[in-house]
Regions:
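Eukaryotic low-complexity, intrinsically disordered regulatory segments enriched in serine, proline
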Residues: 1-94
Length: 94
């Protein structure tokens, strides 16, 4: 795994999280369909496809984000979620 690539993807995940929270500020960032927002933004407004050297199918990325959220929540790692997700996305898509 390329640690630099994972770090850059973690930055993108943090960025989309901040954007999502601003867009959904009226609900304090709560959005049951957050993963669709994230995947759409990551694929259309970020360098994610270039960093992965491929463009994931949006619905697959959405599913992966939901699964990562479930795994992260249940395992409770000490690593911040953006870095944890990024490592796994790089493993899957590169």
């Amino acid at each position: 795994m390329n640690a630099d690539t994972a770090a850059r993807i973690a930055e993108l995940l943090h960025q989309v999280g901040e954007i999502h929270h601003m867009v959904f500020s009226d609900t304090d960032g709560n959005d049951d369909d957050w993963a669709t927002f994230y995947s759409d933004w990551l694929l259309t407004h970020s360098d994610l496809p270039r960093l992965l050297a491929r463009r994931p199918i949006r619905s697959h990325l959405t599913r992966d984000l939901v699964e990562l959220d479930e795994q992260y929540t249940s395992s409770g790692p000490s690593q911040p979620w953006p870095a944890w997700y990024a490592e796994r996305l790089v493993e899957k898509y590169r």
